[in-house]
Amino acid sequence: MKSCIFHKKYLLAGIYIIFVLFTCCNSRFYHTPLAKICSVTEKQTLSREGTRGSKEYYYTQNITARILNGPHKGEKITVSNEYTSSQVQTKKYHKGDTVLLSGSKESPGKTIRSVKRDGYLALLAGGLFFLLICITGKQGFYTIISLILNTVIFAYGFQAFIEGKNILNICNVIAVLFSLTTLICLNGIHRKTFSSVLSTLCVLFLIMALFEFSIYMYGDLDYSNLEYLGSTGNSADIFWADIMLTGLGAIMDVTVTISAAVGEIVRKNPSVSLRRLIHSGREIGYDIMGTMINVLLFVLASGMIPMFILKMNNDISFITIVRYHIPYDICRFLIESIGIVLAIPVSVFIASAIMKIPSRKRGVRE
């Protein structure tokens, strides 16, 4: 049995290595012209005074690269690239980089679009899948399936939005699909799955109702500073959908943990009273509540670090950034934190009620 498991792990490791090597050598399958940089020479062209006494240096690179695909494969081409020392909006290229060129395979251009990155993605994604299956076995496989299905659902949702469908209706549907797909794939058809799905949707409804009520009482947010929305005319709907989908994962984590714990308590002690069961589930929820809220805070803070650095480097004060540039992130964090807190009593009550129903009256497993 152990030898069989080791053979499977070796097979998975071999598949992983082949997958990574393939993505590093798949130039022939690209429709975009690719080239590998053979040599780079550069010179400084000018420098400008920046904020806080710093200097920004400008460089020009003369790059010789060898074309990797198309009818011009093997030919050398010379391209130029300009970049700044901060590399905020430009990039410095190095010898050995594989880059995507402008134009087509039949007529490659002399401008670099970007670096070919599928090798890095294959290394990381393949490593994740390999570790999931090797460490957690069948559960890891189901996790991968749920990731793939959720990605497909997300892609269909975006496609529907591009086709002109209402984004709120789309998000309502995909929120339900995300919950069902994730929980059924990971937990199967169990009581704890039904209680987790029901708890997640109830909490999601409560926090969105609270958000709508606060807007109704105190007025809508000012969306003029949402720079990433550009010229879209439905900023409020997009922000509403953003809150719904962002909070879904954290809420689902709490409801699954509590439902699984309550189910295990009932399985070990079927005669436990409903009051005692609710008390135990509540204590479990309190243990994970602080951790989950802090996880949300860390995710929020880490995502804002580049923006904070750039704006403060341009003499925009910390208080100004907080007042005018991140109120939406703060609002999102507060609503999702409220969702985590609400998920505890809601999931405890629903899970306790469902788990205490006699199993002979239901056609699903404990």
Q: What do these predicted regions represent?
A:
Residues 1-34:
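Hydrophobic secretory-pathway targeting helix
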Residues 101-113, 127-140, 157-165, 264:
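Short juxtamembrane and helix-loop transition motifs at transmembrane-helix boundaries
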Residues 99-101, 113, 122, 256-322:
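Helix-loop-helix junctions within the multi-pass membrane cores of secondary transporters/permeases
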